[in-house]
Amino acid sequence: MSSQVSSARSVRQPASRDSIGVEVRNHIGHLTLNRPEGLNAIDLDMVRTLRQQLDLWADDASVHAVVLRGAGGKAFCAGGDIRSLYESHQNGQDLHQTFFAEEYELDLTIHRYRKPVLALMDGLVLGGGMGLVQGADLRVVTERSRLGMPEVAIGYFPDVGGSHFLSRLPGGLGIWLGVTGSQIGAADALYCGLANWSMNSEMLPRLDHMLDHLKM
């Protein structure tokens, strides 16, 4: 079925606390992590909004693909909201248990998603952000991309599936990332398979334009 932009659906939908932007344009669902002041670190509300919207679009025949991105230009996602998780643990609450369980379920949903998922990994992609993108079908990095698992610096193991995807990287690079918490750029991400396409960040608006006019 062909769809010109003039006839394409453009639908904006409310998201929890506006921390997730939700939009459908030209049969493509766009999900934007919208906490730029916190480098788009994800909290439980955001995890639930992402999962709910992905589940809705999975059964919506008018949505043919999904794009994930972060707002602000500095980060796709800097990981989980560590402050809220730490405070929960210190106060004897179980937010941290609920968060990690549902975050893992969200990542698994993306790995098993029935429709193509494009992840725009512009800026920081750390910890939980790595978990979000590794299940995507197309993972795009830019000259601003920095990938890593910084949670190991506070004594935590590489989570969100890190023990799976890091162990499969060539040349022992995954072990190095998982032990040191170091960050890598676009070229290294492409080399080791953590990304499969690169473009200049200045071209991202052009990519949006092309998606809005894509015939499907």
Positions of the model-derived regions?
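Hydrophobic, secondary-structure "cap" segments at the distal end of domains
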Residues: 163-172
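Glycine-rich beta-to-alpha active-site loop
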Residues: 110-154, 181, 186
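Glycine- (often His-adjacent) and acidic-residue-rich active-site loop
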Residues: 70-105, 155
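Hydrophobic/aromatic residues within transmembrane alpha-helices
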Residues: 68, 81, 132-133, 188-189
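Conserved CoA-thioester-binding segment of acyl-CoA-metabolizing enzymes
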Residues: 1-69, 108
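Amphipathic alpha-helical blocks and their helix-capping loop/short-beta junctions
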Residues: 200-216
